[in-house]
From Swiss-Prot:
<dbReference type="GO" id="GO:0005737">
    <property type="term" value="C:cytoplasm"/>
</dbReference>
<keyword id="KW-0131">Cell cycle</keyword>
<dbReference type="GO" id="GO:0009252">
    <property type="term" value="P:peptidoglycan biosynthetic process"/>
</dbReference>
<dbReference type="InterPro" id="IPR005750">
    <property type="entry name" value="UDP_GlcNAc_COvinyl_MurA"/>
</dbReference>
<dbReference type="InterPro" id="IPR001986">
    <property type="entry name" value="Enolpyruvate_Tfrase_dom"/>
</dbReference>
<dbReference type="InterPro" id="IPR050068">
    <property type="entry name" value="MurA_subfamily"/>
</dbReference>
<dbReference type="Pfam" id="PF00275">
    <property type="entry name" value="EPSP_synthase"/>
</dbReference>
<comment type="pathway">
    <text>Cell wall biogenesis; peptidoglycan biosynthesis.</text>
</comment>
<keyword id="KW-0670">Pyruvate</keyword>
<feature type="modified residue" description="2-(S-cysteinyl)pyruvic acid O-phosphothioketal">
    <location>
        <position position="117"/>
    </location>
</feature>
<keyword id="KW-0133">Cell shape</keyword>
<dbReference type="GO" id="GO:0051301">
    <property type="term" value="P:cell division"/>
</dbReference>
<dbReference type="InterPro" id="IPR013792">
    <property type="entry name" value="RNA3'P_cycl/enolpyr_Trfase_a/b"/>
</dbReference>
<protein>
    <recommendedName>
        <fullName>UDP-N-acetylglucosamine 1-carboxyvinyltransferase</fullName>
        <ecNumber>2.5.1.7</ecNumber>
    </recommendedName>
</protein>
<keyword id="KW-0963">Cytoplasm</keyword>
<feature type="binding site">
    <location>
        <begin position="24"/>
        <end position="25"/>
    </location>
    <ligand>
        <name>phosphoenolpyruvate</name>
    </ligand>
</feature>
<keyword id="KW-0961">Cell wall biogenesis/degradation</keyword>
Length: 421
């Protein structure tokens, strides 16, 4: 097995222009939603990511024809199995998004759970509860979940126990082919939900309310094909804005959506950043000033995104003063903290909160990437740290950032990928 590392020599200021890629959290559910139609679909602005590669392999394994170049062409008319391979599913929990479209169109779907553990079961509870209310029969075993229905799924009024982006996608996608009207209350409001809904509308579903906490879906008997372009990735945008903020420099994020990052922009302005924006770009300039520490509390959209928490941890540890990060969405999402402490950060963990005391500089060392967003914060930390930083297990970052080392090099970083066998 090969393991990639990043070797980063710092400190180097990061500045310039960066082109923002398509949103991973839109691209994945939209690719799985192509299973709802037997008509061909062309999808533009799909990011080049490991999770996208796995999704395309999974669709191909189910029998779909997929051509993946600059544009992704998907034809699922030849799908001949409703069971997703464990070897593919185990590496990506987002594969649960195949279940709703499979049972909605073919009457059956079987998805192996990642790792086949109790944690996996808890992760799919909201998904399967929603499908059950749409009329699916669910068999939930230790290693897999099967959904089946005689005839079509039927519309339902579903009140979600808690806000969940993933479960909202599953229910909305399955309801696209259900008989009658489905109402989702307490739905997730993320821009990626709106993007997925717009794709389903393009296929022929009637959807209202996406982006609010109540979504209404009028199911169609059959869906068509068409062309669709994925929205820009707001988390990638936020990551590069933080890159310039911690470097005390400037950046322009081209092909972005400022309207999806209001809370992030608000907090960056609180830190002292000068921010300008247009319809499809955001510019940040620190004018050489050290940032001021801020307090953020993660919330479902439109609140501060949990996927920006690790990046703002980095911002706080190199800022003036004391800042707090409060995590309310996920447990155990502070795994980047011990790695940053090894680089000289002053951080204290208090239950679901971390308190950061700003330091003048960080010191390069060898660190371990533990998850997607944590790995991004460690890479940025390496860019501004004194000396050599080695980031292990960068496959995490390949899951969610399109050619991050190339984009950082264009901004001035001294970063190299090394493959160890």
């Amino acid at each position: 097995m090969t393991v990639d590392r990043f070797y980063i020599h710092g400190p180097t200021p990061l500045s310039g222009e960066v082109n923002i890629s398509g949103a991973k959290n839109s691209a994945l559910p939209i690719l799985f939603a192509t299973l709802l139609t037997e008509e061909p679909v062309e999808i533009f602005n799909v990011p080049k990511l490991k999770d996208i590669d796995v999704t395309i392999k999974l669709l191909t394994q189910l029998g779909a024809k997929v051509d993946h170049c600059d544009v992704v062409f998907v034809d699922t008319s030849s799908v001949n199995t409703c069971c997703a391979s464990y070897d593919l599913v185990k590496s990506m929990r987002a594969s649960i998004w195949a279940l709703g479209p499979l049972v909605a169109r073919f009457g059956e779907g079987k998805i192996w759970l990642p790792g086949g553990c109790s944690i996996g079961k808890r992760l799919v509870d909201l998904h399967v509860n929603g499908l059950e209310q749409l009329g699916a029969t669910i068999i939930l075993e230790e290693e897999y979940v099967t959904a089946s229905v005689n005839g079509r799924l039927h519309g339902a009024h579903i009140i979600m126990d808690k806000i969940s982006v993933g479960a909202t996608v599953t229910i909305m996608s399955a309801a696209a082919l259900a008989e009658g009207v489905t109402i989702i209350d307490n739905a997730a409001r993320e821009p990626e939900i709106v993007d997925t809904a717009n794709f389903l509308i393009m296929l022929g579903t009637n959807i209202n309310g996406a982006g609010s906490n109540r979504i209404t879906i009028e199911g169609a008997q059959k869906l068509g094909g068409g062309k669709y372009s994925i929205m820009p990735d707001r988390i990638e945008t936020g990551t590069f804005l933080v890159a310039a903020a911690v470097s005390r420099t400037n950046v322009v994020c081209l092909g972005s959506r400022p309207d999806t990052l209001r809370f992030v922009i608000k907090k960056l302005r609180e830190s002292g950043a000068d921010i300008n924006m247009g319809k499809d770009w955001i510019g940040l300039n620190m004018h050489g000033k050290r940032p001021k520490a801020v307090t953020v509390c993660t919330k479902p959209y439109p609140g501060f995104p949990t996927d920006m928490q690790a990046q703002f941890t980095l911002l706080n540890i190199v800022s003036k003063g004391k800042g707090k990060i409060i995590e309310t969405i996920f447990e155990n999402r502070f795994m980047h903290v011990p790695e940053l402490v090894r680089m000289g950060a002053r951080i204290k963990i208090l239950n679901n909160m971390i308190v950061c005391h700003g330091v003048d500089s960080l010191i390069g060392t060898q660190v371990m990437a533990t998850d997607l967003r944590a790995s991004a914060s460690l890479v940025l930390a390496g860019c501004i740290a004194e000396g050599l930083t080695i980031v292990d297990c960068v496959y995490h970052i390949d899951r969610g950032y399109d050619h991050i080392e190339k984009k950082l090099r264009n901004m001035g970083a001294h970063i190299k990928r090394v493959t160890n066998k």
